[in-house]
Amino acid sequence: NKVTTVHNAVDPLPNVEQFKKTPRKDKVVTFLGRITMQKGPEYFVEAARRVLQKTKDVRFVMAGSGDMMNQMIHLAAKSGIADKFHFTGFLKGRQVHEMLAESDVYMMPSVSEPFGISPLEAMQVGAPSIISKQSGCAEILTNAIKTDYWDIDAMADAIYAIVKYPAMYKMLREQGI
């Protein structure tokens, strides 16, 4: 047994309690990362459209920048969900933690992701996470929902379950921290 796998990690936040969610009626589902083909942003937009066909009390945030940003803005508009979709642009440092703490669900639908630390950051501040089975972190995160990146129905169902079933939200939030 000469080989040991050492996975990526995030530094623990010294004062995680400082990041609190603002009480609100609408739920917030966040994609945070580069808006590029590898990250699967179009799957996030399509999953959002399907969730919004079932319920209207959810808002979707795409935080980040990249070569597909304009395409995603147009896709959200073409899908008829622009009024429920927000694009923040690039976030860094404290802004990342604040955005994730405001999220009821974090989603990483990556097509190709060697590891991906953003779900770890999300779970650290209590945001339940839905991640792509194709990401490296899928092998170590036991308290995240895992879907194939192309399975938009599974993603939409997972989002809907977390935002509509408080027990599921609570369990994923508490077990993820």
Residue ranges and their predicted role:
Residues T22-A48, V61, R173:
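Conserved donor-binding/catalytic core segment of Leloir-type glycosyltransferases
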Residues F90-L91, E98-S103:
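Short alpha-helical donor nucleotide-sugar binding micro-motif in glycosyltransferases
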Residues P128-I131:
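Short hydrophobic beta-strand element within catalytic cores of glycosyltransferases
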Residues A144-D153, A161-P166:
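Conserved acidic donor-binding segment of nucleotide-sugar-dependent glycosyltransferases
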